[in-house]
Amino acid sequence: MSKTYATLGELKPGNFIMIDGEPCKIVEMSKAKTGKHGSAKAHVVAISLISGAKKTFVAPVDTRVEVPIIEKRVGQVLAITGDSVQLMDMETYDTFEVPLPEEEELKSRLEPGVEVEYWVMPPGVYKIMRVRGGK
């Protein structure tokens, strides 16, 4: 999957960053100038988009970090089998399976024929983010 690079000082809350090989959304960020001869440091608190775990990262603000390029796509639910959902992409008509979301509210709204927004994230992870339309 694709990713790009940015300096840590350019990022702000709401941006995405790769921490420990997982795409994360920055929820809190603070910058502190250290000593007379030290460089400024950035303290980043982020939530993993894959596992939902809270991750922290401290580095100089001029550090180059990986920024994931997340594709937001639309698909239709074809079937729900056990702990996976079969989706069809609404543009390419490709069919594939993604894990069933862990959020109860989202899981309860999934049924065959419903359109969903799913994200394709590095390293090739698919995740259903929300149900589209009013059901």
Swiss-Prot record:
Main location: cytoplasm
One GO process term, biological-process aspect: positive regulation of translational termination
Keywords: Cytoplasm, Hypusine, Initiation factor, Protein biosynthesis
InterPro entries, alphabetized: IF5A-like, IF5A-like_N, NA-bd_OB-fold, Rib_uL2_dom2, Trans_elong_IF5A_hypusine_site, Transl_elong_IF5A_arc, Transl_elong_IF5A_C, Translation_prot_SH3-like_sf
Short name of one Pfam family: eIF-5a
An MF annotation (GO) of this entry: translation elongation factor activity
Classification via SUPFAM superfamilies: Nucleic acid-binding proteins, Translation proteins SH3-like domain
Localization of this protein: Cytoplasm
Gene Ontology CC terms: cytoplasm
Keyword field contains Glycoprotein: no
Residue positions, PTM Hypusine: K36
Disulfide bridge partners, by residue number: none
Top-level division of the source organism's lineage: Archaea
Xref: HAMAP family: eIF_5A (MF_00085)
Similarity remark: Belongs to the eIF-5A family.
Physiological role: Functions by promoting the formation of the first peptide bond.
Xref: NCBIfam families: eIF_5A (TIGR00037), PRK03999.1 (NF003076)
Protein name per its UniProtKB record: Translation initiation factor 5A
Organism expressing this protein natively: Ignicoccus hospitalis (strain KIN4/I / DSM 18386 / JCM 14125)
